[in-house]
Amino acid sequence: MIYLIRHAHAVPAAEDPLRPLSLAGVHECAMLVRFFADNRLLLPGQIWHSPLSRSRETADRLTAGLNPDAARVEIPGLLGDDDPKLLLERINALPPRSEIALVGHNPHLTRLATLLVRGRSKPAFVDFKKGSVLALEKTESRHKRSDLPRWTVRWFLPAQLLKPRQATAPAQEA
């Protein structure tokens, strides 16, 4: 199983060119960790991340909160504009029952997910908002046109599902 995770919110480039996680991003990571720890849906043995601060920091927080023994590995091919085919061989060579999380950026994650599920990288079938997670499982079949191994969606957690709702004041009568 692989888990594609878009990094949490980062500070604007004008504020810090390295774009570390913002306070909102730190809270998003905490909500992700709490949800996955409570539901035992995500226990990766490895967490791959891009070299960018926001991806690395998201991976650090997931590792610390979900599996401190997980190997956290910076790998090439996870930047927003990278060709998703760069990771295909590495992903498809994973041993059965591997639990790997990939923390990256858009539009790369959307293209990678679409390539794994549909055998081509366009048109996209998923919208990765920051902090969203998609779980994919490799099947025994292959895509007819591309002959790539076929992956199936196990579940998708859009980030907005974990955000606390704002309380609204009851309507006042006139």
Indicate residue ranges for each PLM-predicted region.
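Active-site-proximal alpha-helix that buttresses catalytic centers in soluble enzyme cores
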Residues: 1-85, 89, 117, 128-129, ...
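Generic beta-sheet signal
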Residues: 2, 96-104
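Functional cleft and adjacent loop/helix regions within the main domain
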Residues: 73, 79-81, 145-174
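Conserved phosphate-binding catalytic cores of ATP/NTP-utilizing and phosphoryl-transfer enzymes
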Residues: 90-95
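Domain-level recognition of soluble alpha/beta enzyme cores
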Residues: 121-154, 162
